[in-house]
Amino acid sequence: MSSNFEHDHEENEDYGKQFRPDREIYVVKKDGSKELFNVQKVISAVGKSAYRALTKFTKEEKENICQYVVDKVNELEVDEIPIPIMHNIVESALEQVKPIVAKSYRDYRNYKQDFVRMLDCLLY
């Protein structure tokens, strides 16, 4: 079953061009690899969480999330941000903009962590 709603959460606008930190900042992933921070990845992730919560963001809400995240990243005054810190920043932005999506975002993160722990228990 395909609906228009499934495609509504995807948007062509690149917020990474409009909202940038004031310097190059890298996100340090769980495996230790580093990726240049781009707020467009945040918008993609929160869009998926909104979809799971059966809602979507307005353009203004997306811009508010971007501005919040970039402001917080700039405030840290570091060149590298561990992914758990980035998740917390994004979650805080969502709490301000659309709390139901913050819950979806948090629940999905917890689900992934629980799944990894379960696999670790089975494998070791």
Task: Give residue ranges: language-model regions.
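Extended catalytic cores of very large enzyme megasubunits
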Residues: 1-124
